[in-house]
Amino acid sequence: MATIDTPVKTSVGGSGHAPVRAPRARRGRPGSRLWVKAVVALLLVVEVYPMIWMFLTSLKSNDDYLNNSTWSLPTTWEWSNYTEAWTTGNIGLYVQNSLLAVVPALALMLLLGTAAGFALQVMVWKGRSLTLLVFLAGMMVPPQMILLPLFTVYFQTGLSGTLWPLILTYTGTGLPLTVFMMATYYRSVPRELFEAATIDGAGILRAFWTISLPLVRNALLTVGLVQFFFIWNDLLIALTFTNNQDLRTIQVGLLNFTGDFGATQYGPLFAAICINVFGTLLIYLFLNQKVMKGLTSGALKG
């Protein structure tokens, strides 16, 4: 007759099987954890210290910067450097021009890229795979190769001397990456949602506006933020098409900042750099969590 073995309880000095202990989780050596913390601390210093130094330098007078140690604190805190950079250095105008070029280009890029990603991944039609390859091929074209032809086209069409060359060029150069990323995010959206909407009588436009856009809003925010940093930090395209001082973007303005003062004024110069750097950094810190959600949502298959 078959029997079932039962565990025998053991006592001190008793007989029977020794109790089996659950394996302990392997812990790293204290020395290795210390090295990891040291490396993280070093990377943090490398990233944060230049910003602290830049901010402190922006509060120094020109004599303080030239005559005292580079690592010293300001002898007098010159907060007026920010006012001087914003008004005399025209940083306020350059920020305005950057926003006037970036916001319309970003809106066009996201609208067209999202619609193209929806058409390439949700809608069924012949040639969509080839069309996606064409967009991917656009990512391989360096912007430097098309600047001269675009400059000729804009000059002949009378668009030179406006911000339209920047808006159109930013939209065209950023559209391939936007289409590719949005198509990747749409791939993770369950097809059953769109099939159910079609059965309920929803058309393509309604499915796009009311169903797809709410599902990919985190992806839209992520792609938009990535493209925003690319466009905001651009120097080459802006330098090519802004031949008027009143049309300079923030990066071109910083490049010519010394010329506007006639001589290098280090306090206002670093104040202008701080306005540019910390402004974009605050945007990222404010939207950090949504960006992380958007980065991971495209990797999950619904």
Task: Set out the residue ranges of the language-model regions.
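Short, intrinsically disordered terminal tails adjacent to the first/last structured region
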Residues: 1-21
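Intrinsically disordered, low-complexity regions
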Residues: 14-17, 29, 263
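Short helix-coil transition/hinge motifs at the ends and kinks of transmembrane helices
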Residues: 21-26, 260-263
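N-terminal export and membrane-targeting signals
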Residues: 23-35
